[in-house]
Amino acid sequence: MKQIPMTVRGAELLREELEFLKNVRRPQIIDAIAEAREHGDLKENAEYHAAREQQGFCEGRIQEIEGKLGNAQVIDVAKMTNNGKVIFGATVGLVNIDTDEEVTYRIVGDDEANIKEGLISVNSPIARGLVGKSVDDSVSIITPGGKVEFDIISVEYQ
């Protein structure tokens, strides 16, 4: 499997979720299965089947997270030399040339992306258009909503 780029914070969040699933959620589900078994016939026991389904989802997510962490390439941008170029993990300030609207995005791994928080995936059209560019560069990016032009006003490594 190929390496999965993620920020230090993204790796921490996955580890926290993994710990919660293993130490809190898994025991809760096991208890729910045991309690449902006590209610008798398993063929028509909806509680039992629901708990088993939850167990499947939980175990699947545990495996998924362990796989991602096992293949993670954790990148600490704060330790990198700021040469002004947009790279993975950088926080980029942009001005939309058409609307004069200012936006700030941080380029993160796929699992960390959340556009409402200004976190965009390194594989998104905007991030792909920004990587390698510098402050004062103008970029034209083809997005699902059409062509958008931005001026890069800041690049920070936090």
UniProtKB/Swiss-Prot annotation:
SUPFAM superfamilies xrefs: FKBP-like, GreA transcript cleavage protein, N-terminal domain
Keyword tags: DNA-binding, Transcription, Transcription regulation
Protein encoded by which gene: greA
Gene Ontology terms: biological process: DNA-templated transcription elongation; regulation of DNA-templated transcription elongation
TM ranges: none
Function: Necessary for efficient RNA polymerase transcription elongation past template-encoded arresting sites. The arresting sites in DNA have the property of trapping a certain fraction of elongating RNA polymerases that pass through, resulting in locked ternary complexes. Cleavage of the nascent transcript by cleavage factors such as GreA or GreB allows the resumption of elongation from the new 3'terminus. GreA releases sequences of 2 to 3 nucleotides.
Family: Belongs to the GreA/GreB family.
Organism placement in taxonomy: Bacteria, Pseudomonadati, Pseudomonadota, Gammaproteobacteria, Pasteurellales
Gene Ontology MF terms: DNA binding; RNA polymerase binding
Pfam families: GreA_GreB, GreA_GreB_N
Full protein name: Transcription elongation factor GreA
InterPro entries membership: GreA/GreB_C_sf, TF_GreA/GreB_CS, Tscrpt_elong_fac_GreA, Tscrpt_elong_fac_GreA/B, Tscrpt_elong_fac_GreA/B_C, Tscrpt_elong_fac_GreA/B_fam, Tscrpt_elong_fac_GreA/B_N, Tscrpt_elong_fac_GreA/B_N_sf
